[in-house]
Design a protein with these regions (language model features):
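FAD-binding core/adjacent interface of flavoenzyme oxidoreductases
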Residues: 1-5, 30, 52-127, 197-203, ...
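Mid-to-C-terminal Rossmann-like scaffold of FAD/NAD(P)H-dependent oxidoreductases
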Residues: 2, 253-345
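Beta1-alpha1 glycine-rich phosphate/pyrophosphate-binding loop at the start
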Residues: 2-65, 141-164, 349
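Conserved acidic residues
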Residues: 10, 70-75, 134, 188-189
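Residue-level detector of alpha-helix initiation sites
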Residues: 10-11, 90-92, 110, 135, ...
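FAD-site-proximal beta/loop scaffold in flavoenzymes
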Residues: 101-124, 195-197, 203-268
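Rossmann-like dinucleotide-binding cores of NAD(P)H-dependent redox enzymes
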Residues: 127, 136-190, 288-293
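C-terminal catalytic lobe of FAD-dependent flavoproteins
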Residues: 204-228, 300-377
């Protein structure tokens, strides 16, 4: 019988299994993951919650095998009807300073449970130190503050995430932490202890230290299998490993040849759809304009497109004079990216405009009264 063995229970692995079920794949499907029941990762930093994609009954009903195991080696497919799909995701970067092991990470259900236990066991107002102010660090700092903690956020930059949000909005969002009672510090951590950190020559005491300084693709299994690895498992446009066409890679661990690695939820979903098409021998759905989101301090932040393609930016202010949207334009004036706060339907509208290489006027982009439907007309 044909088979698909998926290694990894994040969004990419689960989405692939669901696609295959919906398309009535005739073979066996199984998912192996050391953490057991597949669950969504973004809620970990947003709320410390573990949200399974589906109950165990869904897998039982559709004949999808669930194996709780840490796969460190396996046999490569021996038939063109059998597939191995690596959806192993990423692993947190270690804080490379003396005592760096004292910092907790926030990358798994076990991490979230451990951090929740510390927050819940302490007195109201306990001190929390967050190292790294990217997506995970900023979201967790907001979550910890809402739980009643005293939070200090250490960043190496005054504008974390400028490369994906645009410089202007990145600066505003980082500065906004102070408006919500979070102390921010720009600098480098040089040493950690069980309950303290040294940064910029000063000691910062804390009952909880969390490091969120980025992630790396989890390629240990791929390396063991002899697959080509270069900032992720290198794949073609059909998600096939360049080293073995019966091995696919999807999600954060995969990188299409000659392209940067995409590391967002939506990209993982699209990888899964492409992998299902490869396995089923059907036409793949068209890739959409990149999109991701983040939640902090009860604000919904969205980015569409790619700011690395922007030659210039245009900002739109709200009634209070704060930046609400940053639009990125290429050298020809075509819209290539945008980031926004509580943008509503604007994100969908901008995605459509980017896909069409639209060239809205500067006046339209700046005008807060120009809504999603009018933009680009």
């Amino acid at each position: 019988m044909p088979s698909v063995h998926i290694i990894g229970g994040g969004v990419a692995g689960y989405a692939l299994a669901r696609h295959l079920v919906q398309q009535q794949y005739a073979g066996s499907i199984k998912i192996s993951d050391a953490q057991g029941l597949p669950y969504d990762r973004p809620p970990l930093s947003k709320s410390l919650q573990v949200e399974p994609f589906a109950p165990v009954s869904w897998y039982q009903h559709h004949g999808v095998g669930l194996i709780q195991e840490d796969v460190q080696s396996l046999q490569l497919p021996q038939s063109a009807d059998d597939w191995v799909v690596l959806a192993t995701g990423t692993t947190p970067k270690a804080l490379d300073v003396p005592g760096g092991h004292h910092a907790l990470s926030l990358h798994s259900a076990a991490d979230a449970a451990r951090i929740s236990d510390v927050l819940e066991s302490g007195m109201f107002g306990q001190r929390v130190l967050v190292i790294g102010a990217g997506l995970v660090g900023a979201e967790f700092a907001s979550t910890a503050k809402m739980s009643g903690a005293q939070v200090t956020l250490i960043s190496s930059s005054d504008a974390p995430l400028a490369h994906v949000l645009g410089q202007e909005l990145a600066e505003q969002l980082h500065a906004d932490h102070a408006n919500h009672g979070i102390a921010t510090l720009t600098g480098a951590v040089t040493e950690l202890g069980p309950n303290y950190a040294l940064a910029n020559g000063q000691r910062h005491d804390a009952e909880l230290i969390v490091a969120a300084i980025g992630v790396e693709p989890e390629t240990a299994l791929a390396g063991h299998l002899g697959l080509e690895v270069d900032d992720g498992i290198v794949v073609d446009s059909q998600q096939r490993s360049l080293s073995n066409p019966q091995v696919l890679a999807i999600g954060d661990v995969a990188r299409e040849e000659n392209q940067p690695r995409a590391v967002h939820w939506e990209a993982a979903m699209e990888d899964a759809a492409q992998a299902a098409a490869t396995i089923m021998g059907t036409a793949a759905p068209k890739r959409s304009v990149p999109w991701f989101w983040s939640d902090r301090h009860e604000m919904h932040v969205e980015t569409v497109g790619d700011f690395s393609q922007a030659a210039s930016t245009v900002t739109r202010l709200n009634r209070r004079g704060k930046i609400q949207t940053v639009f990125g334009l290429d050298a020809k004036g075509s819209l290539v990216s945008a980031s926004m706060i509580d943008g509503g339907l604007m994100a969908k509208a901008v995605r459509r405009l980017i896909a069409k290489s639209a060239t809205p006027s500067i006046e339209q982009l700046k005008d807060p009264l120009t809504g999603p439907r009018e933009l680009g007309r």
